Amino acid sequence: MFGKLLTKVFGSRNDRTLKGLQKVVIKINALEADYEKLTDEELKAKTAEFRERLAAGETLDDIMAEAFATVREASKRVFEMRHFDVQLLGGMVLDSNRIAEMRTGEGKTLTATLPAYLNALTGKGVHVITVNDYLARRDAENNRPLFEFLGLTVGINVAGIGQQEKKAAYNADITYGTNNEFGFDYLRDNMAFSPQDRVQRPLHYALIDEVDSILIDEARTPLIISGAAEDSSELYTKINTLIPNLIRQDKEDSEEYVGEGDYSIDEKAKQVHFTERGQEKVENLLIERGMLAEGDSLYSAANISLLHHVNAALRAHTLFERDVDYIVQDGEVIIVDEHTGRTMPGRRWSEGLHQAVEAKEGVHIQNENQTLASITFQNYFRQYEKLAGMTGTADTEAFEFQHIYGLDTVVVPTNRPMVRKDMADLVYLTANEKYQAIIKDIKDCRERGQPVLVGTVSIEQSELLARLMVQEKIPHQVLNAKFHEKEAEIVAQAGRTGAVTIATNMAGRGTDIVLGGNWNMEIDALDNPTPEQKAKIKADWQVRHDAVVAAGGLHILGTERHESRRIDNQLRGRAGRQGDAGSSRFYLSMEDSLMRIFASDRVSGMMKKLGMEEGEAIEHPWVSRAIENAQRKVEARNFDIRKQLLEFDDVANDQRQVVYAQRNELMDAESIEDTIKNIQDDVIGAVIDQYIPPQSVEELWDVPGLEQRLNQEFMLKLPIQEWLDKEDDLHEESLRERIITSWSDAYKAKEEMVGASVLRQFEKAVMLQTLDGLWKEHLAAMDHLRQGIHLRGYAQKNPKQEYKRESFELFQQLLNTLKHDVISVLSKVQVQAQSDVEEMEARRREEDAKIQRDYQHAAAEALVGGGDEDDESIAAHTPMIRDGDKVGRNDPCPCGSGRKYKQCHGKLS
């Protein structure tokens, strides 16, 4: 009841928002007749006029109605397409830092041209962001004629283009590209050697297509640029041979139950646990193979690396399944996106997991990586001055959009009423019964000539259905991560009479399914088609279209409920576009993942008690509610994980912004002479304080130690003891000043020898190189801190507060080390001429080019759990590192938490 009340309130607020925007729509419509009278040249001149008005002090809101009317009129002339009133509403929502929920087929791509044009008038650049390269290229090329007609330039930013092409793309008025590429360019710009190497302008306005996919589904997966670390492929191969010797047991050991297996899997938490028996077995196997000393423990401090490899191998074998979580193609393990079902070439799991999967599959093992730079989408997109997004399904996640990004969601009405028929779920006892019912439904649809889109949650499931259809001689097309090159073509023709298309999750998103097939694609396939050919293709399509509508339109058939209601709604949304006929139904079984993990055994027991015969389905509101509640639980858990990830990443983000801002200032500055002077006083002063404590008596001074340190670290040979012996009036303060002055004099002598301009350039190069090296080490230290921070909860401390405190200490340490190392290098290195600085810069670039950078959109593996384990969910459970006697799985944990060892530090990550 309370939920319904909230929905009602949200709906009324939505109506009020639309009512306010409707007034502007009336203004735009009133301008239409006048704009139709303008010549092409007069219409094009509007762009220059708007820019002049903005320069004179008018705002975007002041010119919005006229700008939208201009785009609408230009679209009529260039595309022969007129923006509907609902598209004008959508455009206004997108201009006002909000998310527009627009149903599939309502013309989101054309809607985006309105705010893109308006915001491009500022000259600061507009980024239109899509989920893949194909959509970015398609939308850019489709809309290019419209924008160029209005005098704007269009750029495309996708993977694989050169630096100059990227610069040109970013300097365009409107840049289309993928979320990953924009994020990686931001990181690359902050690793650049000079201002000329940067490609991005300041982040002004981002318009995100499929915003739910990018800001929610991918929010847990940070973008990481990493370089190869040491080679440990042989160790992965050896450890991999141990795992097949281990036996799984159904449930975890407890006081009441001790199994015969070596490990157990917690499917709900996606974790795997060694049993006490399994732990001993692994240690014995390692000893047999000479990888562990006799009597040594896997959990001793010296064996941390070995434990890491064993954990990774066990997870690879038990939690990651081929053709579900990844595929093997051309000798490489390629991750499959759990949300879209698409493959993600070039991306790798972190923490050694990818190498463990490669060892499992017997393919070439690539080196582990060291993080060079990383950022989450949450923190990247929050840097934009203006942010907006559009999708067909945002309403279910409206709270998260508002809470995390400050974006309100506005549901834009459809241009025509929705007539799709959404039928109740059918639940079967077994998966086999479910698949038989699905095949029967498909056959019935084909007899009527009704096209069917079958949505699956994994590649494995899509291939199983494909095999069943081959057996039943049902012609079909398979669209999954293995064949996404043909994705758009298959989806576009999925609406033909009697067509059967199997699609993994939301593969093909962004391409409309037109009833009767896509006649435009047929025309595009011909070389220079004649008007007669075009007319015939369109006439044939009209016949097919009418036949499909008569058969009931596109039928959506879901083979399993997804964890998120939103993704189920996306599948349903493929039918019923622009008022078309259509229908949808989900087929479920008690063996489905969601039902097995989250629906209780009572549901299955009740179904059996009802005396259901084989092949019989249950269709009841109570069951539907139970499924929806299970989905809500998972959604809430995933939201908590994303929220906690953000809270932790915010700490790192504050530091990242400070470092990147400092780095950019260094690169842009003509000279950093003043900076060097300031830090020189700090560094030399801090070293003196260690040997001559402030306001201390001379007996406490360590003068020989100070002389040695100044000579070793700063090439400063000073007779300090001799000064003190000869000069009775030389006190602590004057001595300090003399030492600092001595360093300054030595540095000035160096400057006179090589020339001021050469030294200034050298200072900048040293500062940047030192900062980059320390930042890389700092990222590794922060990762290490985050992985173990949950343990503070056992000491009655707040892990989040402890993380903030310790990360600040690490950052302070970074800044102090930076100052010290820069002054030390500048003191020691002898620069002879300009060529030395140039050689240093060239060597640095050469070394960087050798680094095989890996661009990951790697899942945040350490971030698991949620729900009741609020703080523990921040990091994977790290096994206790222990020396001495072995702790039993059911013994009290040595950390003092009061919990059993297996439930505390005995958990595997």
From Swiss-Prot:
Gene Ontology cellular component annotations, sorted alphabetically: cell envelope Sec protein transport complex; cytosol; plasma membrane
Primary site of residence: membrane
Major enzyme class: translocase
Subcellular location: Cell inner membrane; Cytoplasm
CC cofactor note: May bind 1 zinc ion per subunit.
GO MF entries: ATP binding; metal ion binding; protein-exporting ATPase activity
SMART domains: SecA_DEAD (SM00957), SecA_PP_bind (SM00958)
Signal peptide: none
Binding sites annotated in the UniProt record for ATP: Q87, G105, E106, G107, K108, T109, D512
PROSITE patterns listed in its UniProt record: SECA, SECA_MOTOR_DEAD
Compositionally biased region (Basic and acidic residues): 880-889
Assigned EC number: 7.4.2.8
One GO biological process term: protein import
The reaction(s) this protein catalyses: ATP + H2O + cellular proteinSide 1 = ADP + phosphate + cellular proteinSide 2
Main function: Part of the Sec protein translocase complex. Interacts with the SecYEG preprotein conducting channel. Has a central role in coupling the hydrolysis of ATP to the transfer of proteins into and across the cell membrane, serving both as a receptor for the preprotein-SecB complex and as an ATP-driven molecular motor driving the stepwise translocation of polypeptide chains across the membrane.
Assembly with partners or alone: Monomer and homodimer. Part of the essential Sec protein translocation apparatus which comprises SecA, SecYEG and auxiliary proteins SecDF-YajC and YidC.
Similarity comment: family membership: Belongs to the SecA family.
PANTHER family assigned to the protein according to its UniProt record, in alphabetical order: CHLOROPLAST PROTEIN-TRANSPORTING ATPASE, SECA INNER MEMBRANE COMPONENT OF SEC PROTEIN SECRETION SYSTEM
Protein name listed in UniProt: Protein translocase subunit SecA
